[in-house]
UniProtKB/Swiss-Prot annotation:
Species of the source: Stutzerimonas stutzeri (strain A1501)
GO molecular function, one term: RNA endonuclease activity
PANTHER family, sorted: ENDORIBONUCLEASE YBEY, CHLOROPLASTIC
Annotated disulfide bonds: none
Protein name, as recorded: Endoribonuclease YbeY
HAMAP family associated with the record: Endoribonucl_YbeY (MF_00009)
SUPFAM superfamilies in UniProt: Metalloproteases ('zincins'), catalytic domain (SSF55486)
Binding locations of Zn(2+): 111, 115, 121
Alphabetical list of Gene3D superfamilies matching this protein: Metalloproteases ('zincins'), catalytic domain
Length: 160
């Protein structure tokens, strides 16, 4: 079971907690046992500040992942880490890319959760593995391939 701590520090419209929970559970189902993670929904000001502080990028990005660095033996439930999602950026990207908000939110939550599990996309082989898993999980939800050649740019971690 995933214990989700949802923090809403945004005035924008966000998905229902049940949807966020469902997307996290889907992305994290390969992990056995209970886990805890936090999703913090922010506006552009906080998103920009966090991106500047942690990545030295002076703009708000869609999702930031902060894997926990606490040994499991010190916790009642293993802590996976935190996701920070900038609500206005998600809304803007979905509109610019011609995606439904639901599909884009699902993609970003899954993408962030996979980062918490250690997946990355710095090297081409790692990117292919991570994107293939994202495609599979999104297809299970009935969402289209966000990386399809005929779809608009995804905007996912375009600056990494």
């Amino acid at each position: 079971m995933i214990e989700l701590d949802l923090q809403c520090a945004s005035t924008g419209a966000a998905p229902a907690a049940a949807d966020l929970q469902r997307w996290c559970e889907l992305a994290l189902r390969q992990r056995s046992g209970d886990s805890e993670l936090t999703i913090r929904l922010v506006d552009e000001e906080e998103g920009r500040e966090l991106n500047r502080t942690w990545r030295q990028k002076d703009y708000a990005t869609n999702v930031l992942s902060f894997p926990a660095d606490v040994p499991d033996e010190f916790l009642d439930i293993p802590l996976l880490g935190d996701l920070v999602i900038c609500v206005p950026v998600v809304e803007r990207e979905a509109a610019e890319q011609g995606k439904t908000l639901d599909a884009h939110w699902a993609h970003l939550v899954i993408h962030g959760c996979l980062h918490l599990l250690g997946y990355d996309h710095i090297e081409d082989a790692e990117a292919e593995e991570m994107e293939a898993l994202e495609r599979q999980l999104l297809a299970e939800l009935g969402h289209p391939d966000p990386y399809a050649e005929d779809s608009p740019e995804t905007g996912i971690c375009k600056d990494s």
